[in-house]
A protein has these predicted regions:
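Long, charged, low-complexity, helical-prone intrinsically disordered regions
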Residues: 1-412, 417, 430, 438-442
Length: 442
């Protein structure tokens, strides 16, 4: 008989699997950063610097203030991790390189249409690899431009032909990223000079690789539909059916039904609800817990869109919006920007979710904003008037202290379609009645 889980149990399992089931360490070090990446299986790279590059935020959400060089040291000095296309451009354990080789063999050059340009200039393209072999590691600016122009660059986020060629070789696994400049520019080198020989030589057939990727995804997600599992490594759902069936037959994932979910779900063996969830964390738009919109809506009833590329007049929430996780709920969202010249963390807009205990959430969010600002070497948090949470948050920011590890529940009432019995992370006495919520928080 298929096991049934409440939505609260599923949410607790997912949050725990994502690494929010324990307090932040007092002094985050290499071992903590390493453990987060291994637990998640990958961290998506994104260098949009409205707030800070997103991959650093993913670690901060779980570890609190840490030295950002820890991540760079693990990837580019110790080379325990490396860059490759996984869930988009990502940081992955070097041991995962063989699991992605079948995708490297199928890699298409970017921007779309650049394959044809490479074919038309094959002789010059070959010299780029020769240059890296002779002089690497090299950045794109070190490669002489061939004078080639192509319409495929018209809407690309980079327009360098040498960069596109280096990226094509990287995507195909011939090159790897040796290190990055302070301005984030990549330095490319031959894969055999970056990836340890034991991983470079390991051969994994495509079916075995897909099975292992789904296994990693299942562990990182805790509970997931087949679409959730496939999305983790940007796999077609049709390619996920066989590895899911094999892992189920081996008892590594278990079929379950979740309250309110139309599709069947898969529970990673050993995954279970956390005994207590005390997280208070702002989540990057590229955090694995929230990057797949259908899953975040199923788990949290939270509608989330990344609107940085949306025309201003069509944006609902803002340019760079981070949800705020508190306990087992997403209770608010803020549109953030780092003003490095004025040394301010700017809250451009702030919005609360329905049914929250407003003073408690405002206090916790204000504390987290203060902690984030200090970590970014910003002196002040400012809150603009936009959003239905702005007034309460601004008042809390004025009196905020550093974030405490534990705080009462954010809920003012039980959400719709769920049992009124609180999950293990929520003391029953902290849940307020709907009438009290209307009297004091509205």
């Amino acid at each position: 008989m298929t096991e049934r889980l409440s939505l609260a149990e599923a949410r607790s399992i997912a949050i725990a699997a994502a690494g929010f089931d324990r307090p932040r360490p007092a002094k985050p070090g290499l071992s903590h950063a390493r453990a987060v990446i291994h637990r998640l299986g990958l961290i998506q790279l994104d260098f949009v610097n409205v707030l800070l590059p997103a991959h650093y935020q993913v670690l901060f959400s779980r570890l609190g203030p840490y030295h950002r060089r820890l991540l760079d040291h693990l990837v580019y000095r110790r080379r325990e991790f490396t860059e490759q296309w996984a869930h988009e451009a990502s940081i992955i354990p070097v041991a995962m390189w063989p699991l992605l080789r079948h995708r490297m063999a199928e890699h298409r050059a970017r921007p779309w249409g650049f394959d044809r340009v490479m074919e038309e200039h094959a002789d010059w393209v070959a010299t780029v690899l020769d240059e890296v072999r002779a002089r690497g590691p090299l950045e794109a600016a070190s490669i002489e431009h061939p004078g080639v122009t192509a319409s495929c660059f018209d809407h690309a986020w980079f327009r360098s032909v040498p960069r596109a060629v280096l990226e094509a070789y990287f995507g195909r696994g011939l090159l790897a990223i040796a290190h990055r400049h302070e301005n984030m520019a990549r330095f490319y080198d031959l894969a055999e000079r970056v990836i340890p020989a034991e991983h470079l030589a390991r051969q994994v057939d495509p079916a075995g690789a897909r099975r292992e990727l789904i296994r990693i995804a299942a562990r990182a997600l805790g509970i997931a539909t087949i679409a959730d599992l496939a999305d983790y490594f940007r796999m077609f759902v049709r390619d996920a059916h066989r590895p899911v069936a094999e892992l189920a037959a081996a008892g590594e994932i278990i079929p379950v039904r979740v309250e309110g979910w139309r599709e069947p779900a898969w529970l990673a063996a050993g995954a279970k609800p956390a005994k207590r969830l005390t997280a208070a964390a702002l989540l990057s738009p590229f955090d694995p817990l929230i990057w797949f919109r259908p899953r975040i809506e199923r788990l949290f009833g939270f509608e989330h869109r990344f609107e940085i590329f949306t025309p201003a007049e069509k944006r609902r929430w803002g340019v760079y919006v981070l949800p705020f996780l508190m306990g087992d709920r997403l209770v608010a969202r803020v549109d953030l920007k780092s003003d490095r010249t004025a040394r301010r963390l700017c809250v451009l807009a702030s919005w609360k979710e329905d049914g929250i205990h407003v003073p408690v959430v405002a206090e916790a969010l204000a504390a987290e904003l203060r902690t984030l600002a200090a970590w970014l070497d910003l002196e002040k948090v400012t809150v603009a008037r936009k959003g239905d949470f702005a007034r309460q948050l601004a008042a809390a920011v004025r009196g905020a202290a550093p974030c405490a590890p534990n705080h009462p529940t954010a809920l003012a009432r039980a959400p719709e379609n769920e049992s009124s019995t609180p999950p293990p992370s929520v003391p029953p006495s902290c849940i307020r009645s709907p009438s009290a919520s209307r009297r004091k928080d509205r």
